[in-house]
Amino acid sequence: MTPLKPSDLVLTPTHLRFLGRRFPCARGRCGLTKAKREGDGATPRGVHRVVGMLYRPDRVAPPANWAVPIGPSDLWSDDPGHEDYNQMVRAPYPHGHERLRRADPLYDLVLITDWNWPRAVRGHGSAIFVHQWRKPRHPTEGCVALRRDHLHWIAERLTPGARLVVR
């Protein structure tokens, strides 16, 4: 692996490090794994790239000029048996998915990683995002989650392709 840079998002057991700052965070309820599987509740180890940023335009301003608004019909396919697995799709969509436009604020701002993307291996996990946490350090289904203001601070300074390092 190439040496770490201050612009890398580095996940440690207790925090996420970025630009010399440490942010408390949450990770998968089942810890970290090198062998990620759909629904296992683990955060995949490795070096991932941030390949997209989504935001709810009815709730927050775009934090960066490359952020894309989440529309009412936007979904993320989590059906390993379908060709759109681990891709953003639109309703109506009859296969397994999760809504990106949620009633709660968890996906008001989302950083999309390249875990198992763009050519997904079926069953190897989907929707590995960096998003707002439910409550302090409350485990996720495999994503990395942060306090709302910390997530926005990071998003305002992040560049496309930044690395998320999970060790």
Residue ranges and their predicted role:
Residues 143:
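Short cysteine clusters
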Residues 1-140, 149-163, 167:
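Cell wall/extracellular polymer interaction/catalysis modules
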